[in-house]
Amino acid sequence: MAGVNNRVKITNDIELKDRLVAINRVTKVTKGGRTFSFSAIVVVGNEEGIIGWGLGKAGEVTAAIAKGVESAKKNLTRVPVLKGTVPHEQSAKFGGAEVFIKPASHGTGVVAGGAMRAVLESVGVTDVLAKSKGSSNPHNLVKATIMALGEMRDARMIAQNRGISVEKVFRG
């Protein structure tokens, strides 16, 4: 929806947990030989609807992860989570990666793979069905998953945007 801002300003009272999605060793070939560095994709979230992702690059693995966490903290988004699942089905595409997220009943667990699982667990979703198609590149999967979650709307948000009551959203 146009005009909806889900950005979150970071404050000290938000306790964020970070998850490492992928780490990659990168080689730069120079006249003097090979230079190695590392890139890390990190997802941070408070497991209550706030999520962010970041990319860190450095000569050491720990420094790359730390830079990724700092980058993720600057890129936070709020996502609606209802009773441990998502409000409705949603799909999104980023690059060659396409994701499909569907709500699940209590006790199902997080049925998702790789990078999608890290994002969904960080946002606080405990029961969801998710499928990725196309590219399995973790960069694109993380971005597509966060894009799909960012497009989610619960009944309260819809009522607020339309200027009507929550009951009227359901009854028409």
From Swiss-Prot:
Keywords: Ribonucleoprotein, Ribosomal protein, RNA-binding, rRNA-binding. Residues 16-79 form the S5 DRBM domain. InterPro entries: Ribosomal_Su5_D2-typ_SF (IPR020568), Ribosomal_uS5 (IPR000851), Ribosomal_uS5_bac-type (IPR005712), Ribosomal_uS5_C (IPR005324), Ribosomal_uS5_N (IPR013810), Ribosomal_uS5_N_CS (IPR018192), Ribsml_uS5_D2-typ_fold_subgr (IPR014721). One of its GO terms (biological process) is translation. Pfam families: Ribosomal_S5, Ribosomal_S5_C. The keyword Ribosomal protein applies. One of its GO terms (cellular component) is small ribosomal subunit. One of its GO terms (molecular function) is structural constituent of ribosome. Disulfide bonds: none annotated. SUPFAM superfamilies: dsRNA-binding domain-like (SSF54768), Ribosomal protein S5 domain 2-like (SSF54211). With S4 and S12 plays an important role in translational accuracy. Located at the back of the 30S subunit body where it stabilizes the conformation of the head with respect to the body. The N-terminal domain interacts with the head of the 30S subunit; the C-terminal domain interacts with the body and contacts protein S4. The interaction surface between S4 and S5 is involved in control of translational fidelity. Belongs to the universal ribosomal protein uS5 family. Part of the 30S ribosomal subunit. Contacts proteins S4 and S8. This is Small ribosomal subunit protein uS5. The lineage of its organism: Bacteria, Pseudomonadati, Bacteroidota, Bacteroidia, Bacteroidales.
